[in-house]
Amino acid sequence: VDPALFDMDLMEQKAPHGSSIREFLEDSSTILALNGGFFEIDHSKRLSPSGVLVINGKIRNASLHDRLSGALVRNSEGITIIGAKDLGPLTNYDFALQTGPILVEDRGKLGIRRNDYDRVNRAAVCLRDHLIIFVTLHGSDGNGLSLYEFAELLAAREIDGGLGCNLAINLDGGPSTQVGMKVGGTREEVDGLWKIHNAIVVRRK
């Protein structure tokens, strides 16, 4: 999407036990919803965010998660991807989602160093020039790509069959992977296997 034409935001679950992508898409102004960051589940099956989460300038969780190395943020300069250790004061952000790992580093450098061959469904946000690209990958049997393979796809040039991302960050994946969009008066959804804590949503300006 082009940020000049569309707004991208984060949305939190509508109930303590999570929301499906269908529920995130119910807002009439939302045209696309994609699963967001990782989350914890307590003994009562209530969901809470893993790591820093800021939505509409309000800090929902201020605690850094030591295993999530990146963050998708929007501040006065726009939307970008940074290292979690570089977040600084959370009051600087309209939204901030700690997640990771960073799959494509600055200027298209591969952010994953080795292949563990753990192939599951994946989701990511890719920044390319002035565009924001939302990527989900669903294997029919639940077997998608490893993080290394996913990063290769995102970093590769378009002429080589990739997406040519300048920066890209991994979102929650596996059973959480889900996306929905409204196209030409119809709704298209790819459901996940369970509900999620937060989602990335896109609205027309």
Residue ranges and their predicted role:
Residues 32-36, 74, 167-171:
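General beta-strand structural signal in soluble alpha/beta enzymes
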Residues 43-66, 113-123, 127, 131-205:
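Conserved, well-ordered active-site substructure
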Residues 34-36, 83, 105, 136, ...:
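Pocket-edge structural micro-motifs
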Residues 3-5, 76-80, 126-133:
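Beta-strand-turn-beta hairpins that frame and shape the catalytic cleft
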Residues 13-17, 84-90, 137-142:
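Short, solvent-exposed aromatic-acidic interface loops
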Residues 39-117:
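Active-site-adjacent helix-turn-beta-strand microarchitecture at beta-sheet edges
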Residues 1-64:
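Zymogen propeptides
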Residues 1, 35, 73-74, 105, ...:
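Hydrophobic side chains in beta-strands
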